[in-house]
Swiss-Prot record:
It comes from Caenorhabditis elegans. Residues 1-17 form the signal peptide. Keywords: Cell cycle, Cell division, Chitin-binding, Developmental protein, Disulfide bond, Glycoprotein, Proteoglycan, Repeat, Signal. PANTHER family: CHITIN BINDING PERITROPHIN-A, CHITIN-BINDING TYPE-2 DOMAIN-CONTAINING PROTEIN-RELATED. Glycans are attached at S50, N268. This is Chondroitin proteoglycan 1. Residues 267-295 are annotated as: Disordered. Gene3D superfamilies: Chitin binding domain, Glycosidases. Residues 58-115, 211-268, 524-578 form the Chitin-binding type-2 domain. InterPro entries: Chitin-bd_dom (IPR002557), Chitin-bd_dom_sf (IPR036508), Chitin_bind-dev_reg (IPR051940). GO terms for molecular function: chitin binding. GO terms for cellular component: external encapsulating structure; extracellular region. The gene is cpg-1. Expressed in the germline. Disulfide bonds join C91-C104, C244-C257, C554-C567.
């Protein structure tokens, strides 16, 4: 006898600790007839569940269906039955359970309350403005009618926000109330009742006859007919109609949509099978049983006089859809053209044109200049790397012994500047590091008038030659960084750049033309191989390699040593002990 009440109290306390919803267990079954036996509830019961209105509650759910049941006419509590288990629930705040809407409602909207609480003897207002207790879960004293069966449950002390669960002693252990599990969250939150009826029977799904084509087939894709653009996808015995893009047919072997010429079933390449539309069934025609191309029928109605907008003829009311390409008929007096599908190949035939072959022989690039009338013209054959310059009124004369002539080794890019008499010309040649022009005699000698000192500079990069007439001093400055050319006003200057093609220049009429032929000389080694000194204790020295001589400069602070054939400090050179040369 003692174990069952203790177990009941333990279950109540466990459920309270699990859910902890305020007001959930405020008013458990009210079976006592005394005021103290009902407890204070939330501290503001407004006379709803006080000892004055305590009534006997039928909590037996063994004979009830799952659902919600009202406890009294105007009560904030209600009973829930689920699987034969009963639970008493409390409405939030000052709400009353309304069985009409199966939810908690304000008392003035519940017919059983008539606008006032159930206790008609009470004079309290329907909506009190203040509460009477501070602790909403004040402990309730136990009251028993049979002292021998009383079970004393010690009061629990907790630091949590929720007070211990009230214990009630019952005289009938069989009518113990289980622990509630939930309560409504809002005044109008409906509680879905539990039903114990049989589950709703599955309604049979009616499918069209076309779905039977996948019965017994494995999941996959299947052609809907021979040489058809429609095919079906089977999944779990159900058919999904599908269609290839325009002008393509489904190849079941490769499971792709391809041109009809590549599909083995389309033997004639046109996609049309023999036989009429009346003798063709949907399964054998390769088309879906409906004109829309899918496994269902659309209800769209098209008038008979509305022409089809597709590129092939399609009967509107018939179930057969012709394959394409098909025959298309236009208005009367227009011939009908049946076009079978063929690859789009365009063949163009051009008239025969006799092919003419022209063979052009190689001609050297010879530049010919024709002068005015009465001027003899001289054409010079192509000789590479020869520049011919004709000066007016200058006779060809061999330079006398006392006329110095200097000829340098021929190097590319020679620029020649010619000025008239008594005009001093200064030409500054751009500086090139560690390269000095070497003068070699008897190479491509150029002869000028008698008593005219001529300096002919062989071709070398960025070196300019200045030639003046008699009694005109010419100054050639060594390498410097800037090139400055000064020419007096009204004096024509002719600059002839190097070109591999011979250019012939002729003067005006009545002017005799002199052609200087290219003079061929045998090259004589102009230098001794190796490095040699130019002067004692000098930073400059000459170096001859393969007959080509160049002048080099030692690094700063070093001088050329003839004994060592290299640049060395001055204290290692005997010539430097006598005289120290410093160049600026």
């Amino acid at each position: 006898m003692t174990l069952k009440p203790v177990l009941l109290a333990f279950l109540v306390a466990s459920a309270y600790a699990q859910y902890g919803v305020a007001g959930m267990y405020e008013n458990l079954p009210l079976e006592t007839t005394t005021l103290d036996g009902s407890g204070d509830g939330s501290g503001a019961d407004n006379g709803f569940v006080s000892g004055a209105d305590a009534v006997a509650i039928d909590t037996d759910c063994s004979t009830k269906e799952d659902g919600l049941y009202a406890i009294g006419g105007c009560s904030p509590q209600f009973l829930t039955c689920s699987g034969g288990i009963s639970r008493i629930m409390d409405c939030p705040a000052d709400l009353i359970y309304d069985p009409r809407i199966v939810a908690c409602e304000y008392s003035y909207n519940v017919p059983q309350c008539g606008g006032v609480p159930q206790d008609v003897t009470s004079t309290q207002e329907a909506y009190p403005s203040e509460e009477t207790t501070v602790n909403p879960y004040a402990p309730v004293e136990e009251a028993t009618t049979t002292p021998a069966e009383d079970v004393t449950v010690p009061e629990e002390t907790t630091t949590e926000a929720y007070a211990p669960v009230d214990d009630y002693s019952t005289t009938t252990p069989a009518e113990d109330v289980p622990v509630p599990v939930e309560t409504t969250a809002s005044p109008y939150a409906p509680i879905v009742p539990y039903t114990t009826g049989a589950p709703a029977a599955d309604e049979p799904v009616t499918r069209s006859a076309v779905t039977k084509s996948c019965v017994g087939k494995a999941d996959g894709f299947y052609s809907f007919g021979e040489c058809s653009d429609h095919y079906t996808a089977c999944s779990n015995g159900y058919l999904i109609p599908m269609q290839c893009p325009a002008r393509l047919a489904f190849d079941e072997a490769r499971v792709i949509c391809d041109y009809v010429m590549n599909v083995p079933e389309c033997t004639n390449g046109s996609g049309n099978d023999e036989g009429s539309a009346d003798e063709t069934t949907p399964e054998s025609s390769g088309e879906m049983p409906y004109s829309n191309g899918y496994g269902y029928e659309e209800t769209t109605t098209v008038a008979e006089d509305v022409p089809s907008t597709k590129d092939y003829a399609e009967p509107i009311a018939a179930a057969y859809v012709a394959r394409y390409p098909s025959e298309k008929t236009t208005a009367e007096n227009v011939p009908t053209t049946t076009i079978g599908y063929e690859p789009e190949v365009v063949e163009t035939t051009a008239p025969y044109v006799e092919e003419t072959t022209t063979t052009v022989g190689y001609k050297p690039e010879v530049e010919e200049t024709t002068t005015e009338a009465e001027v003899p013209t001289t054409t010079v054959g192509y000789e590479p790397e020869i520049v011919e310059t004709t000066a007016p009124y200058v006779e060809e004369t061999t330079t006398a012994a006392d006329v110095p002539s200097t000829t340098a080794v021929y190097e590319p890019e020679v620029v020649e500047t010619t000025t008239e008499a008594e005009v001093p010309t200064t030409t500054t040649v751009g500086y090139e590091p560690e390269v000095v022009e070497t003068t070699v005699p008897y190479v491509e000698e150029t002869t000028t008038a008698a008593d005219v000192p001529t300096t002919t500079v062989g071709y070398e990069p960025e070196v300019e030659e200045t030639t003046t007439e008699a009694e005109v001093p010419t100054t050639t400055v060594g390498y410097e960084s800037e090139v400055v050319e000064t020419t007096a006003a009204d004096i024509p200057t002719t600059t002839i750049g190097y070109a591999p093609i011979v250019v012939e220049s002729t003067t005006a009429a009545d002017v005799p033309t002199t052609t200087v032929p290219a003079e061929t000389t045998t090259e004589v080694p102009a230098c001794v191989e190796g490095a040699t000194a130019i002067e004692p204790c000098s930073q400059h020295y000459k170096n001859c390699v393969n007959g080509q001589e160049a002048i080099f400069i030692c690094e700063n602070g070093l001088f050329f040593s003839p004994e060592q054939a290299r640049c060395a400090p001055a204290d290692q050179i005997a010539e430097c002990h006598q005289t120290t040369v410093q160049y600026y």
